[in-house]
Amino acid sequence: MSTKVLIANRGEIACRVIATCRRLGIATVAVYSDADRNARHVRLADEAIHIGPAAARESYLRGDALLDAARATGAQAIHPGYGFLSENADFADACAAAGITFIGPPASAIRAMGDKSAAKALMAKAGVPLTPGYHGDQQAPDFLRTQADAIGYPVLIKASAGGGGKGMRKVERSEDFVDALASCQREAASAFGNDHVLVEKYVERPRHIEIQVFGDSHGDAVYLFERDCSVQRRHQKVLEEAPAPGMSAERRAAMGQAAVDAARAVGYVGAGTVEFIAGPDGDFYFMEMNTRLQVEHPVTEYITGTDLVEWQLRVASGQPLPLRQEQLAIHGHAIEARLYAEDADRGFLPSTGTLRRLRLPAPSAHVRVDTGVEEGDSITPYYDPMIAKLIVWDVDRDAALRRMSQALADCQVVGVTTNAGFLRRLVNTDSFAHARLDTALIEREQAALSAVGDTDDALWQLAAVAAVASTAGATTDARDPHSPWQAQDGWRLGASAPRVLPLQQGERRHTLKVWTQAGGWRVQCDDAAPMRVTGTADAQGLAVQLGERRWTLQLLRDGDQLYLFGADGQHRFTLHDPVGESDHAVADAGSLLAPMPGRIVATLVAAGTEVKRGTPLVVLEAMKMEHTLQAPADGTVKGYRAKAGDQVGDGAVLVDFDAA
């Protein structure tokens, strides 16, 4: 094998590759952009070399810079990770021309599978089942709509060169087709530099099942069983598990053989994934082949006891596959959840900022955490906002589900908004718990997944106690608890006044009053009867009793944000200044602000138009995806402060708005 490997990637996958290389005694070279100068993968590698500015197209997507870095450091091989140049055939060719091993499939296989239309034709010849659709070169909007009409709705528009859920739209009606096509093509052109699309029949209530395949240069190929990736939003995977629930041995063998046939058809070498759409009737159809390691590969590693990165390194050096098909077996059940910096209650808008607190579950035989960040690092608008992958394993699915729910509850993240609460609710939905899986599961479970009303009422009282305790010097077990200078009870001549604390979580808001008393507090929420809370509390946490329940919670105060961490997860409250709140409940009802830095793609409503709350007004491209910003209330669009093509900063005013 190579003795020094350059990793042409960043974040958690770069750290993942470094870990295996270190175990095998292989030296590693990290590359970094301006934004990643102090990133975790840079700190972990044996060497690191700068390759350009923060923008990916000027750094991680520059094949020439990566090859220069490999030559400068004496790296004999390049591991591309996933994303960026991992499926770029020209880059694979350039590595070969430079005498540097590309740890991936041959360029010919990447080309064959990279164009989805051509790949479909190739799979048809190989006898791999296909969904009905149009995979040709004609791209005129009217022609494609005619094809969609003939196929029958709903249809799926997909970027031919795409992946990762980008450049993909489901269309329900003919009259919506042209607008969906335009949006899909814009996103595809931006993400892949190619706006060519194909149109396919959308299989109702489909499951997304993929097969992990591996080939070597000696002509052998195996499948390492399946992963169920049906739980998605916006065509991006949210939860992945292996093996697929309810998979019969016969269907597993049939799908595995079809995947191996697909790999053999293109002379595949290395790790690859063949993705299928599976219908409720048991039929399955080839969707695409990803010619790289997948984000969700750890669940396969858990159930097979393999290290797929090690397999990649060995196969790339010309060694045969480490195991034959008959030596591979499934052991237990594994589930992966992707912890993202995003706001599930605001359409999954990405969140940027500094990780002022980051506590993830402790790794064990049952829990694995793959991450590219540490406390103090920043989530920037330049790259994917993943914080970590949480992977759990146990002897069966029910046990693995319990472990995942607890792992998500153990996550403590301050500085950005995350999807941890959403993921925990998702894992605990009836549909997921009972394996009623399809790609519409999240849409179907919207009511259960909403965070509105999710917080236990008792936690509001405890949050109020925490707000008092987080004040400097406030603690019921202070050195002299009887000293008047330690009192936080609002005492004044003539009466004992409570602390008045307006607290907010999401759209829910309450005013709480707290009286500090001997051994605890008396807390009133709005006009309800006051409740007695006993125990101890300080700026680090609470150990208290409310009614018949005992609570042990960690506490963190970050400006006006109050965080409670307990056995059921993380709870964030905003503490408002009670002075003048009635006049300033909304920071600025007369405008629509950019939720993150990005580029304006389109303005959707003319100035002067009266709109309803939720009407789409602006399309913003950020973090490789298009995000539609909606009217905050009923009212009139007065005008726009940015036009299509403009770059805007976080918090920039985009629309002047008159609320009705």
Q: How does the language model describe each region?
A:
Residues 323-331, 443-446, 450, 570-594:
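Long, charged amphipathic helices and adjacent flexible linkers at domain junctions
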Residues 259, 298-527, 616, 650-659:
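Catalytic cores of soluble metabolic enzymes centered on carboxylation/carboxyl-transfer
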Residues 173, 215-220, 279-282, 362, ...:
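Short acidic-glycine loop/turn motifs at beta-strand connectors
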Residues 582-660:
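Structured functional modules or segments
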